[in-house]
From Swiss-Prot:
Polar residues compositional bias, start-end: 15-25
Functional description taken from the UniProt entry: E3 ubiquitin-protein ligase. Component of the ribosome quality control complex (RQC), a ribosome-associated complex that mediates ubiquitination and extraction of incompletely synthesized nascent chains for proteasomal degradation. Ubiquitination leads to cdcD/CDC48 recruitment for extraction and degradation of the incomplete translation product.
Single Gene Ontology BP annotation: rescue of stalled ribosome
Reaction it catalyzes: S-ubiquitinyl-[E2 ubiquitin-conjugating enzyme]-L-cysteine + [acceptor protein]-L-lysine = [E2 ubiquitin-conjugating enzyme]-L-cysteine + N(6)-ubiquitinyl-[acceptor protein]-L-lysine
Protein name: E3 ubiquitin-protein ligase listerin
Gene Ontology CC terms: cytosol; RQC complex
Transmembrane annotation, as ranges: none
Keywords: Cytoplasm, Metal-binding, Repeat, Transferase, Ubl conjugation pathway, Zinc, Zinc-finger
Amino acid sequence: MGKDRDKGFRGAKYNPSSSGEANTLMGSQSSGFIGFSAFSSNLTNATDPDYYQVEPEYKVLLKKLQKKDSISRIKGLEELNSKFQKINIEDAEFNISSISPLMNAWEFMYKRLVNDDDRNVRDLASQCLGSIGSRIGKHLGPHVKQLLGPWIVAICDQNDQSINNALLSFQNIFPEKKRKDVFKFGHDEALTYLCENLQETPQTIGDSKSISQEILQERYERCISNSLLAIEYLINNTTATATDSSSSSSTTTTTTTTNNTGNTEIYEKIFESQFFSFFQSKSSNIRKTAYRVLTTVIKKLAGYVEKNFKDFSSKVLGLFSEKDSSTHLYMWDAIISFLQQYGDKAWSNVDVRKHVLPRLWAFLRSGCYGSFELSYPSILPLLTFIPNSIVIGSPSPSPSPSPNTNIDIGFFKELFTNLEKGLEVVDNPRQYGNPNSVDRPSNLLLSCYLECLIYSSKKWGQQYQQINDYLIDTLLFNFYNNHFNLEHSCFSEKLFIEKLLESTIKLANLSNSNLLKIQNLFNSNSFINFNNKENLLNNNEPITTDNNNNNNNNSSPIIKKQEKIIQPISKETLISRLNTFIIVCSNNNNSNNSNNNNVIQVIIKRLFNLACDNLNSNQELSIKILDFILGNYKIDQIISNGLDDIKKIITQLALALNESLLSTGGLNLGVGGDLVSVIVGLLALVPDEDEIKLIWSQILQIFLDSINNNNNNSKKKNNRSNLITNTTNSLVHLINSASNKINRNLLLSTTLFKSIKIQDKKQLQLIKSILFNNNNNNNNEFSPIIPNESVELLIKWVYNKLVDIINTMVQLNLVFNDNDKGGDNNNDDDSDDNDVSIDYLVELSKLLFSSRFKSKSLESLLIEWCKFNIEINNRPSLSGFKSKCNSIDEYLFSTTSNIENDKFILSLLIESIDRNSSTIITNDNLNLNFLSNCAIKLIKSGSYRHDENGDDDDDDDQLYSYFIKEFTSNQLVINSKDQIKISWFRYNRITPFYLLDNYGSNKDNNDSTTFSTDKLLKVLIFNFKVIESFGLEKFIKYSNKENNNSIELLLLNLLFVNGDNQLPPTPTTTTTTTTTITTAVVVSTNEQILEFIENNSTNLLNQFIESLFKFYGDEIFNCNWFNCLVSNVGGDGNNGGIYSVLLALFIDYITSDACLPTSSMKLKSALLNSIKIDNDDNGNSIDSIRQLNLVQILLPILQKESIESYKQWSINQLSQLSSSIPTNFKSISIQLSILSSIVIQRQQQQHQQSQKEQQQITQDDNEILKEKEWLTLLNLIQTIQQWNSKIKSAIIKQQEPELEFLFMKEVELSCLNFILIVIQYISNINSNKSKQPIYLSNNQSQFVQSFLSIWLSNNFTLLSFNKFKSNYYYQQYRNLIEYQSLKIYNIIISNDNIKFIIPGIGDQFQIDHSILILNNWLNRVSNSRSNNNNGNTSDSSYILELYSNTFMKMSNDIKYKISLTKLDNLIELLSTFNYSTSIYNNKGIKKTSYNLLESYFGNENTQLVKSFLLENENNNNNNNNDDGEEKVSFILFSNIFEKILLDFDSTFKPMKKSKDNQLINSISMGQLMCWNLLLLNYSKIDLNRRSILNGWLNDNNIQKVTLFLNQIFPFINKDESPLTTTTTTTDNNGNNYSIEFPFSIIDNDQLITYRMIQKLCSNCFYSLVNYLPSMVRRWADDNSTNSKMNQQIQSYITRFISPIIIQNEIQRVNSYRCTDSDSSDAKFQIKGSTSSKEVTASYEKDEMTISLVLFISDNYPLRVLTVEFSKRVGVSESQWRQWLLSMTSLLLTQDGTVLDACLLWKNSLDKHFQGVEVCPICYSMFHNGTIPKFQCKTCKNKFHAGCIYKWFQTSHKSNCPLCQTDLS
């Protein structure tokens, strides 16, 4: 590498260090370096590193530092740094003598590392130096001289590190006060080292054979730059600057060094030998560094500069030739520092005009070579240092020069001309962004240009007139001239004007002569001559500039480009620039300097006069200028003759406005708008109103004369109409604009409105302008410019037209939809008075309503619009008008000034709901949301009116009072109590004996009642919406004042809406268009009702009860309405149940969390005190149903003592019963009911308490009944069973035929809960292992079985109910029994309860009753599908959910057996959509069906497909005929199942067009369920039976899987994984399988959404790939020609599916263990790796090992495994190939897993070594579960029977495939 610098060890850096000097500088010894005074003796000289003396561990690390790769060096430095940090010289075991050789070696190595190519290496080397220096302390002293040079190089390293580790190391080792001593101590050696570095070249700095030239060049530049910076660092730390004060006239700074003369000479030698040569280096980095050092030399080494001043002047002032912008910062620093240091002397020793100025001019012409931000701000400082001798040719200006002195101004021409030429480089909008950006480089040039111009005028222009003329008349004028004449501008517009105006003012402030010269400049005709401007604007010829005129004083302006076409300025650009110019002038007009204001006023006056003089010749430009000026200046600042000038100008402007109107055919908002603005501005300056009227009359006369003159000459009617419209628009615009400045009454004119033709819809905007000051008023306030009587005429005209339209449409019952025009008039000519569109009336009415004009006629118009709006929103035939009238809704249904009108409008809304069916608007056509919103809006607006009047009393809210009175007086509302239907499932607090009291009622079959229910629902919802919007507290407050029954009515009607009252079926007959529309409205109305009931009704009822408690407090129980409520609880018929429910709701609130505990206790006490329960003398006993219901409702708040008393009373009474049949069953029923309610209530409380305390409460913790009491109940079961047996006996039936009916009627309801609590008790006892189990006796068990059988089989003893099976109460009774019996059955089959409750016959009992439950479930589903269920759909929801839970608890064996009986029914439910049930139930039905079918399909013995062999009749006659081949037919077990699987026309095909159709989505989900069941069965059966199912999937050349994949794949979200943790199941080995349907996907959503179908499709797709990979591969191959489809398939499987399948395959392989049944004595091992995707299998037998490796591809199973046999000792090549074919066949055609393939290989090996050969036809040892047994007697080869038979069929001969022997 280059020269051998170590040869001979020459040079100062290898000289011995001065230990004597070091000794004087070292301090006391310490662990840290504290100075050189610590040395007490001389040290031995260190020469070449002695590696033999270095410790071996360091020697190894130092050798690592010599490695070529940087990674090794970095690791070596890290280890070395770690070693250095562990050095402890104070340790007794540390060898001090080892430091010297180590440091000698480190010196040698560090010098190499500081210029390493890797930045990290250089940084780590400095860290190592810091570490060892801080550890060895004073022992570093002898090595400082050799280390200082490279150390400073490292400090000055120009890397991108945020932390300078070399500098940190230096500062940590040496204290601040000792650092100067360090630099002195090692100064000479360090400088010598740096000088040697400067001698390097790219050829000597490295080996060019092994290192690229680029790296060498980079290394060379880094070495030179860092060395130069290191020299600068030494200079700055060893010298100081001082000012020589001996000569006051001297401008130079002398430098004295604190070092010796020898050091200065060393610097001089460095600079003389090679420093200036670096200025010519090709490396910009080296040149930049050299310029930086040059600045330091100028400031620090003044003596050296003085000695070589001529060279320095030439070099420094010649730096303008530098073209690299990255170096210009230091270049300018050096130049300015040199000129500051030496002033004029700097120019004396150099030929400026030959050596300096040409380079400077070239620098400026080139745009400073790109350094805009640095160079342009530096040109002015440079100009200040240029002496006069160079500028004007004389050493200094004369003290009093003559103004006419002739001097050379060539310097200024060159300076400013070259700056102009530099603009061609700088002005590049594409490169430098937005032309209007303030950061444009041209803006920097502009600032530089103007600053130099001002400075030149100030320094030289004031003394030499010639210079000043050139600067102002030529240069400054050209700026203005070009800016207002040329389109292109190189500068930002606003910044240019600001800078130019600022410079103009500064020039004017320099002297009075400058001010006069500038004023004359602006007053001259050449400054913005409008006549010339007009010619310039109309001239299409471009202007061409020539560079031949550049030497002329009137040279081309700065903006012109040489030899380029300059585009004249456009009108828009000129107007924009003039506007900006005037605004900037206005901003500068507020200065206190009179000269500033004089200059600006001269400019503005000149512009104003030009605009006024050219109004006729150049109207648009003149008007714009006038508008700009008047908007920024006061008129008295511009004109001098006052009012006369204003009148003259206004007249000129009015004529111009009229001329513009006639020429353009209308008001041009560009020119005309500006004209109006200027006229208004001038008109507002007239102080006298009489003068304003006079001027205004002149303006009107101008327009009227124009209309009349043109009217006489006009031939067409349309022209006259347009002229009137345009003229009126102009006047309206003018009046509206002047209204804010002038009294508008002075400008009003009745003639204006008379010229308008109202029926012409073109006049709409004109009318709006007349009524509203919409040009100057953002709020569009009503401010008409016509008299009030004219407004009244307009209102009456609109009213009459609207009435005519309404009467016509209502009487004729016209039909209009959205496609009709609705009476629109599209005629552009004058419209006929009788032909007015509804749209036009809407717009006119909106204008009038928004005006809030106080007029009775306007209120009448409002009422008429309200009528019409009600009609169109509730009549389908007028639905097309909704869109046309929507915009007027905000103005309707607002209060008028008359309360009677408001009540009339409100009555219209109420009556629209309460109309008879014979009217036009029927209850089936109501838009409830619209009507309620209108009523709310009307009442609220009335409240606001009272608030505005300062009256907050609710008594004055007459509209609300009127509404409530109408509500409470409605007969439907009053009679709603008779139609309330209560669902037992919602309010199951009491024993529903009212169901038995109402069994004879048949109200459901009365058509009039059904219609009343429908109508009542709509009336109630309308009223509820209004009441809720105003707050329930307001309703309560009103009701309390009126003291009426409104609260009770509201409670009952809220309960009615929350009950089971259903809407009648929607009519579906559609015969005409009108009927179709009506049907749509009916559905919409019903949806409104259902939506309100579902979302608001329950909350509203609870909120109302809460509001009642907040209003009344504990006084609520003393209210008459509450006492009435309590008195009706438990009464006869339906009313008893209704009031029981209401009381229960009040108690629910008291016991809820919404009621505070203190308030709850108070309310409980008050309620119990207010309710009197009639008891007998014996204590707490119950004798009536009313009393029973009261106690049952009050149980949550009764005291424990009362509850205990009721419990003991019931038990005592029941314990006294005997086997004799009692005479009164009612009392027994009451006793059973209250006891059951107490137990159930207590169980619920315990459950709630356990949930709050998060702990399990056992029976022992708080017993409900004692063990003795439970035994009493168990005995009671036996007693009731004895009664039942006796009652059903033939004797009793003959003697008392009604006894059985009475028994079942009175006891059955009570037994439901009674049996439930007993069964629950037995279950709890038997689940407690510490308790003795309880078994029911035969009689007790028979009692449970008999009742349960009756209930589940629906064989009710109440035969009279059969007459009214459509009756609601019968259905409620049936639902109650069905639900409770299911709960009992649930408990029986849970855990092991069945063996305790039904001992001995549990299995048969479960099968028999499970079949009954399945049949009941199917019947309920069927009834709900056919809409025959008269009960509430919510009841069905509860029951169906309980059915689902019951089936889930059944064992798979039971479900398998019962599903066999109803397979087709269950399958059909998967694909059925039920409109009559909720979507949730629809999904629940599917889920339950799937759960039952899963037990069938998941059974491994289930065979879905059967195969049949079909023989062709020609087979026996012609064996050579191909048609004689035998065929196999496959039959699926169910036609319905097959239809669902393949019915794509009903699922995914229509889904492409309608993705949100619930019917399609539901059927599609059922189809996906069926496919999932099919795959479930496929996964359970063995490989041999899969071939039959595969045969059906491919039967009749129909690829069923391919068809299915083509349907579902487009719906899959390709960016989402198909399998989540919630949709997978895990087998015993922990492998994930998607064999269960992912119900977690659908359970979270209420609807069956398209997104849900997407997820289900992706899940099913995964299952297909997992279980049927061969068919998926075939499908993928078929789509390989479709590049887009193929890419999607490959990407989706590779990204999401393959990783899961591969993971499962590997887990399955690793979890495999050999079974005990394996009789082979061979050792078989198998293992897999997920990371490498490899499976390795080894087979060891008789000391012989055979192994294979299976490689799984990333897109497995699309791509089959690759098999490699790593060891095959003892097995032939052909045998291996046979096994490979067998494994490939298994994977390709039989869908085997990786483990199956490995086990097949193992079995093949076992058979192979047992002497069994593979079949030569299929190359497999196993076929259909058999081994080759058919043997050829000749060749002795054995074949599979199936293979050889197939061979005979295909080859049409019976010869051996190998030896061709006839085998027949």
